[in-house]
Amino acid sequence: MKFLIVFCGLVGLSACFPSVFDEPDVLTDKMVEFINGQKTTWTAGHNFEYIPQERRYVHVKRLCGSLPQKHSPVKLEQKEVVVDMDLPDNFDSRVQWPMCPSLKELRDQSECGSCWAFGAVEAMTDRICISSKGAEKFHISAEDLLSCCSSCGMGCNGGYPSAAWSYFKRSGLVTGGQYNTHQGCRPYTLPHCDHHTTGQYMPCTGDLPTPKCSKTCEDGYNKTYSADKHYGVSVYSVSSDEQQIMAEIYKNGPVEAAFTVYSDFPSYKSGVYQHKSGSELGGHAIKILGWGVEDSTPYWLVANSWNADWGDKGFFKILRGQDECGIESEVVAGLPKL
């Protein structure tokens, strides 16, 4: 311990302090104060306060359900995007395609490691609307993908984004909105919960099991399960090249990506995130819907699935062009069959 104190004094607190964080400390005032004391591009704040301190670490790890692509049973062919246009410095899919309301929506994965499914169906939903020029505005069901794709992984215990897109092309997915919306064939059956603050939902109290695969639509829906299926015509991985990812979004809409979550990320509130401190919590899948530059720092604009109470109203920005936390290494997408 004496050596650690002396060493910190020699090399500076900012270089040594991250190593002394224990797992129970990662979502505390200590972490927030440390991040905000750095000269960095983002601001930390108090998230997950409604979760008891002794459960926060385990709760956030549970939400990180994207399994490493190297272990995936599905390897998608990489698509080379022809960058035949001048890409703008700033791009936001919500502005580019205002006729598609799903681009502005934030879903809630609840207490389930289903981020891999949410990142996929969110991008699929957006791309169907974009490809149809706003004619098709339904939601692809996270419930259907989570519960019925046996090759995708382990449901609420994690899955593979690449396998999710492969399933979309091979088996198709039905429609389904968020919990208690009664939208579509199979809405999400896991309830919203307050991960972060005392708010409008019930508190998150414990892990939830993967829903059972049901190949019937909820009562009152006007189609059969098989008639409600929607398919991808092509699915692929996208090069980790920054320009390739930008061109893919610019041409076809949001993509799904996965990155490594470290224990400082859950405290994000604003700015352009880059990892500063803490241990690895797991992989997390999200939807990238644009990019830009903030105070000379390039970023990706990302929609999370931890409801709108987290971060910057549910969204966040992360450093672009440096493969920050692996965000540019596992990008997948596809085109819908209309």
Question: Whereabouts are the PLM-identified features?
Answer:
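Catalytic-core signature of thiol
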Residues: 2-8, 12-338
